[in-house]
């Protein structure tokens, strides 16, 4: 018997399924890309505008300080765009974009503490000081945030055939963000929020947006996220708790009230670091600042005794002189043209201002509001809208002076409180401009607390009548210039016109 053979059959082996590949990086959707550059560019412009107000208490608000801030921020934007593009080509642009957004927010949160720390030392040191504080406080955040646009573009550019469309779209959204940031800050945020609060909100928004974007793109590790959150909390608290020098942060000023030493019921109104007004809450006849005493004496000369006066005040401040006029010349009517609504509200809430027929605030730019004043309606016009750092140039020109003449009665008085130092080029220019409109122009250089008349408040008096001024004894010590001396003093002064009024360059600041 033949034994049968069993043929072994091959055993089939099934291979185990291959592990799934790790998920690839999450693509940056065009809408997210557009929103990111919109936010970053808008934040830069918002911080730039807010920096002007944030720095004003320390370096003033002039054309030159504003130019320094704008120029420094533009340099930061250019630097950030250039360096950001280089790093976007050399590193993971997703992680870079997230890091830049978080870092930009953290640097924005540092803006207020840096300004509060460096600002006091910059006061009185001119435009280089303004530039230095800006470089330290604002340029880092502007540069970091400006590096985001080229990084986003690097992420979006996958098809060179569509590169023009992509770059154009991102540029459009970045510009739109800048526009929204600009208009939103000027028209909404500054009137609504204190400047320091607005900067805090911007910084928190940027940093939180960076964290959310990092989670969405899976581009931030747990340790980095925890560190970012700690930074947000720490810097947010630092920014929020840093003392503000302002009792009221208005659209135009950092306003502060101080008790006047030696007076039970008197306050100083301090605007952007300058002592603007002395207000006695119980006795409006008490006017302590020498320049107000000089102007009051000039008004008394025009309206002797207690004769009522129809007056237009250009600039309200603490409303010291309008209230003095109502108390010393019963029946007087004062229109007070004040651009700063919040300052008027501060006067009403904290300084006892009660608007009435005798003292009527008119909120708006005086150059516009003056057009509503009837011709030949005012005995006096008082120009008191100038400080050592803030010069509304449109209220110094020949065209403005023509408007003042229209409002004045024949023989009426136009008195200006101007501040100048050094060579007095600004005072000479304004006197020369007044002499083109009025027959009798005189100058009073008011002494400072130490009796020095080499700079500070200067009272310019202009009228068509051959007026001889009489002054109270407590206003003595000033340098007075009669008509002939004033003409010699201002003989080479620049005529200020609407199309040529370089007042910021003519003004000389102490220690500037």
Mark where each language-model region is.
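Alpha-helical transmembrane segments of multi-pass membrane proteins
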Residues: 2-248, 259, 263, 273-276, ...
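Soluble small-group transferase modules, centered on the S-adenosyl donor enzyme superfamily
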Residues: 220-278, 284-288, 298-302, 442-512
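Second-shell loop/turn segments in exported
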Residues: 281-285, 388-391, 416-422
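Conserved class I S-adenosyl-L-methionine
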Residues: 306-317
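Short alpha-helix immediately C-terminal to the canonical SAM-binding loop
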Residues: 344-345
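Short loop/turn elements that flank and shape the SAM/SAH-binding pocket of Class I
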Residues: 367-371
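A short, conserved alpha-helix within the catalytic core of class I
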Residues: 389-403, 426
């Amino acid at each position: 018997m033949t034994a049968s053979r069993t043929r072994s059959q091959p055993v089939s082996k099934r291979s185990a399924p291959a592990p799934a590949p790790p998920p690839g990086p999450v693509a940056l959707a065009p809408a997210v890309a557009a929103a990111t550059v919109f936010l970053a560019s808008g934040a830069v412009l918002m911080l730039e505008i807010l920096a002007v107000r944030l720095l004003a208490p320390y370096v003033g608000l002039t054309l030159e300080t504003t130019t320094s801030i704008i120029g420094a921020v533009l340099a930061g934007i250019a630097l950030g765009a250039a360096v950001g593009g280089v790093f976007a080509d050399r590193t993971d642009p997703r992680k870079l974009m997230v890091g830049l957004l978080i870092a930009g927010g953290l640097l924005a949160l540092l803006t207020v503490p840096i300004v509060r720390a460096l600002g006091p030392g910059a006061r009185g040191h001119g435009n280089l000081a303004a530039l230095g504080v800006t470089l330290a406080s604002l340029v880092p955040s502007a540069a970091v945030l400006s590096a985001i646009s080229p990084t986003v573009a690097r992420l979006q550019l996958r098809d060179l055939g569509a590169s023009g469309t992509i770059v154009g779209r991102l540029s459009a959204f970045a510009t739109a963000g800048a526009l929204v940031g600009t208009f939103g800050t000027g028209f909404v945020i500054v009137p609504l929020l204190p400047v320091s609060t607005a900067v805090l909100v911007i910084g928190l928004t940027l940093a939180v947006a960076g964290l959310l974007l990092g989670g969405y793109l899976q581009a931030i590790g747990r340790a980095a996220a925890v560190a970012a959150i700690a930074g947000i909390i720490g810097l947010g608290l630092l920014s929020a708790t840093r003392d503000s020098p302002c009792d009221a942060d208005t659209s135009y000023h950092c306003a502060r009230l101080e008790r006047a030493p030696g007076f039970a019921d008197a306050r100083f109104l301090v605007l952007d670091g300058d002592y603007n007004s002395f207000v006695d809450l119980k006795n409006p006849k008490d006017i302590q600042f020498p320049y107000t005493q000089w102007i009051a004496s000039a008004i008394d000369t025009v309206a002797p005794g207690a004769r009522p006066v129809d007056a237009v005040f250009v600039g309200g401040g603490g409303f010291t002189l309008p209230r003095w006029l109502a108390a010393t010349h019963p029946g007087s009517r004062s229109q007070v043209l004040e651009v700063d609504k919040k300052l008027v509200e501060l006067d009403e809430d904290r300084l006892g201002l009660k608007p009435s027929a005798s003292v009527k605030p008119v909120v708006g730019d005086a150059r516009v509001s003056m057009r509503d004043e009837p011709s030949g309606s005012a005995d006096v016009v008082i120009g008191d809208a100038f400080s050592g750092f803030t010069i509304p140039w449109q209220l110094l020109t020949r065209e403005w002076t023509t408007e003042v003449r229209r409002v004045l009665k024949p023989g009426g008085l136009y008195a200006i409180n101007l501040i100048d130092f050094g060579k007095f080029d600004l005072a000479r220019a304004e006197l020369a401009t007044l002499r083109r409109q009025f027959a009798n122009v005189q100058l009073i250089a008011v002494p400072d607390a130490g009796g020095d008349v080499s700079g500070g408040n200067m009272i310019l008096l202009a009228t068509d009548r051959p007026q001889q001024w009489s002054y109270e004894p407590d206003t003595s010590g000033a340098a007075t210039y009669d008509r002939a001396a004033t003409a010699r003093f201002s003989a080479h002064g620049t005529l200020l016109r609407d199309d040529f009024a370089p007042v910021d360059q003519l003004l000389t600041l102490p220690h500037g």
